Amino acid sequence: MIIKPKIRGFICTTTHPVGCEANVKEQIELTKAKGKIANGPKRVLVVGSSSGYGLSSRIAAAFGSDAATLGVFFEKPSSETKPGTAGWYNTAAFDKFAKAEGLYSKSINCDAFSHEAKKKAIELIKEDLGQVDMVVYSLASPVRKLPDSGELIRSSLKPIGETYTATAVDTNKDCIIQTSVEPATEQEIADTVTVMGGEDWELWINALSDAGVLSDNCKTVAYSYIGTELTWPIYWHGALGKAKMDLDRAAHALNDKLAVKGGSANVAVLKSVVTQASSAIPVMPLYIAMVFKKMRQEGLHEGCMDQIYRMFSERLYRTDGAAPATDDKQRLRLDDWELREDIQQHCRDLWPQVTTENLSELADYMEYKAEFLKLFGFGIEGIDYDADVNPNVSFDVIEL
């Protein structure tokens, strides 16, 4: 089929397999160009490995550290009428490139919140790897099916206490709007913590630990975002922030457990990037377009791959073998460049000035749009989007 982008809301409903493969190849080449990560992990499980920071983590481990990787994700292959999800094509490409270099790569397509996912991962680790020395937890899901009861719990992207009104960008019409979001109820806050908090990360690590498949000195990391006062009402001070604070709670509990055998658990606070997850959060697209422009001007811009490589090489797996620098909550801070005072002051000054007319001039808005489309395999140089492509891409994946 000939595949063109179709946008609905903040999701692109079509994906381009050749474009997705090109994206993955670009991240692999970037990793190789940066060089090998000394003291890097060798057997890595990535929960939520098909896009964004999870995919970059799998690439950093495999191509930066020659690690065997096992990826867990929930994606859809193509059907007769429509292409598969971007994460499906991303993983197919990763698997192809990893195997071409003789690297172990296995993937499980399933609900990562389920008991079955954990059982299958443990089984594969026991059979093929013995143990893992790193577990990356990078799930971004709006819904969690509770593994025991089967109840579906939904998260909310809402403020707490009062209605949040702010300048935002309508990414469909490319115009500046005022957006208002009603505050979350107590139940919605609790549900958001259930879906996006640290409980499932704990369930994964405890299951792996009980099964004896975590090596001594095993490191685990889960990803978070804190941001600044520009996004705090909807994010850190909102329902989602409560969930991310629960991730901090889980990190401390897991760290106490793993430290007994020389291991560690940390939350890594990452910078804002264009992902399917961030595009769904009100005000984030506008903030990202602003902050990207300033960071590019200052030579500080990083994409997912740059961030994760820096986390591996300068935090978790330092050449000198020293423990990573953390903040007072034992978090790894990779948002340090974004939070620089001059960068943030620039955004604070700019925010009230943005109009539909000057949007592309004051912020990297067209670059934001291009990055967004790229997530789905579109707008990549050298690809003929009028060519007929086969959407049916298969690879070595276990379906649960």
From Swiss-Prot:
Keywords: Fatty acid biosynthesis, Fatty acid metabolism, Lipid biosynthesis, Lipid metabolism, NAD, Oxidoreductase. It catalyses: a 2,3-saturated acyl-[ACP] + NAD(+) = a (2E)-enoyl-[ACP] + NADH + H(+). It comes from Shewanella denitrificans (strain OS217 / ATCC BAA-1090 / DSM 15013). Belongs to the TER reductase family. The record marks 75 as: Plays an important role in discriminating NADH against NADPH. The keyword Coiled coil does not apply. Monomer. GO terms for molecular function: enoyl-[acyl-carrier-protein] reductase (NADH) activity; NAD binding; trans-2-enoyl-CoA reductase (NADH) activity. HAMAP family: FabV_reductase (MF_01838). The keyword Oxidoreductase applies. The active site is at 235 (proton donor). Its EC number is 1.3.1.9. NAD(+) binds at residues 48-53, 74-75, 111-112, 139-140, 244, 273-275. Involved in the final reduction of the elongation cycle of fatty acid synthesis (FAS II). Catalyzes the reduction of a carbon-carbon double bond in an enoyl moiety that is covalently linked to an acyl carrier protein (ACP). This is Enoyl-[acyl-carrier-protein] reductase [NADH]. It is an enzyme of class 1 (oxidoreductase). The gene is fabV. It comes from the Bacteria. Pathway: Lipid metabolism; fatty acid biosynthesis. One of its GO terms (biological process) is fatty acid biosynthetic process. Substrate binds at residue 225.
